[in-house]
């Protein structure tokens, strides 16, 4: 069930009263029933036709960029994250039903009797493993970001609902800048200027004020999830990081809203320092996008086989163990690097006139065209825990616009 506009809302029957009688969730896509459903919901296929291989060179070059819009949820953690986070979204909305007395108390500032404890979930993994893309797919699977309700069960319900608020943690993040970011983003979604400047005008660090204003945003617009990406950036803040984390704990406990965090393993180390969050991570879900440690890894094999279907060279080649070994060797299992090499190898084959890719094309493309990535990939090849801890920074440097 997908709505096509703000006003096009279809409330469905699930035969569960806590869902059907709640206007905040009766229209949402239900959590997947099983692993296969989760796989289908998460997958993102680039537009492709085998006849594309006969198109002019300039068009095929353009179409290769479609691999940027590709996601294959081959890792079991991908599916667990979708099932877990979408379930938490529903769990969080159930006690906030605005048609119930309890939900009305929460809406108008009273202390709601929230029996389902809010959770904090973490999606962690190396840079390039697809954390942000997984978040994109999980959120899109739930429904639209914003809905304008009108009537529910023949009762007026002229409410604007924001399903999620998602922000990247800036490198110099404070509670104030984080709240200001959420306020400005809410204005952007609504197309209004309700919260712009509220947080900037506050001097000092009045935690109660910040909580009060964020509470207004969450309750007034029925926000279902708070999502924070690039959470590892807090590691640059020293003592200030603890204040931001403490603020998130307050949000979770006082507002009853699930929070989803994504970041590298630095983010995990930041959160592990708070026992309350560590406990909640176990309850809410820790989704580790572990790097495959060999070309034999089942999820990596499946990923390569699915991606290999998207070839825009004139001559199609079949996937083989040698090709998978080559893709692993040049990427060390990092999804983003593997897809970049695959796309670049196709461009190389088109440019040199061979019009076919194989394991040799992959290795040559990596060696000649992707030298900025070599230091980062060599770190992973070293298998040294001390060096691997520096991989994310090395990859970030390689992808920086100022590189080379």
Task: Specify the residue positions occupied by each region the protein language model found.
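C-terminal alpha-helical "lid" subdomain
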Residues: 1-49, 65, 220, 293-404
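Conserved lysine of the Walker
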Residues: 131
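Walker A/P-loop-proximal flanking segment of P-loop NTPase domains
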Residues: 1-119
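Post-Walker A helix-loop "phosphate-sensing" segment adjacent to the P-loop in P-loop NTPases
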Residues: 141-154, 188-191
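Hydrophobic positions on the alpha1 helix immediately C-terminal to the Walker A/P-loop
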Residues: 134, 138
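Mid-core helix/loop region of P-loop NTP-binding domains shared across ATPases and GTPases
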Residues: 101, 112-116, 158-159, 174-181, ...
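Hydrophobic anchor at the beta1->P-loop junction of P-loop NTPases
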Residues: 123
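The catalytic "switch" region of P-loop NTPases
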Residues: 215-225, 235-237, 245-322
